[in-house]
Amino acid sequence: MPIPASPLHPPLPSLLLYLLLELAGVTHVFHVQQTEMSQTVSTGESIILSCSVPNTLPNGPVLWFKGTGPNRKLIYNFKQGNFPRVKEIGDTTKPGNTDFSTRIREISLADAGTYYCVKFIKGRAIKEYQSGRGTQVFVTEQNPRPPKNRPAGRAGSRAHHDAHTCLSALPERNSTNYFVQPCCCLRLLGLTGLLSK
């Protein structure tokens, strides 16, 4: 009686095909698919990194990394670990699953970089089989801070501070309270002529 295929026991034909391709040196038949080459996101938002991995290979984990080489940073492991800002999109426990996409929330400027979805194969040791082409993430600051250009000298600094305070306190133009401001603020901002109109 044949043994039914499962993620732990792939179908015999696909295992034989994999072994034949390995022996022949053909390793680029299988592709880890990352659909987006680049994405732009603002700080504080979330981003989805897409990854599709065919289920025709022998068992082995899929991991997400930021960067390449020996200094690459592990971003997500679908099997174990604590990754508070990262969550998987697909159900990787479901037999036949091919979706290894992830969502990263609360993006910061430090999250800019290139992210890789990487397939490993279990053997005597876990061996990296193939990586996706990578998704480059650009991060823009949502509310950039204004530059601190204060005028020189004590009086100038005080005037700049008062002007900033007055400007930030002024309501919208369509507000009925637009001109109800302390006289010093109006004088400082050169708006005293508005009172006579």
Swiss-Prot record:
- Which cystines does this chain contain? 51-117
Name its cellular compartments: Secreted
Domain Ig-like V-type, residue spans: 31-135
Q: Does the keyword Disulfide bond apply?
A: yes
Indicate whether Repeat appears among the record's keywords.
no
Q: Name one Pfam family in it.
A: V-set
- Predominant location category: secreted
Which positions does UniProt annotate with glycan attachment?
A: 174
Gene Ontology CC annotations of this record: extracellular region; plasma membrane
Task: Indicate the secretion signal residues.
Answer: 1-29
Q: Which UniProt keywords apply?
A: Disulfide bond, Glycoprotein, Immunoglobulin domain, Secreted, Signal
Positions of the UniProt region annotated as Disordered = 139-158
Q: What is this protein called?
A: Signal-regulatory protein delta
Q: Which organism is it from?
A: Homo sapiens (Human)
Q: Which gene encodes it?
A: SIRPD
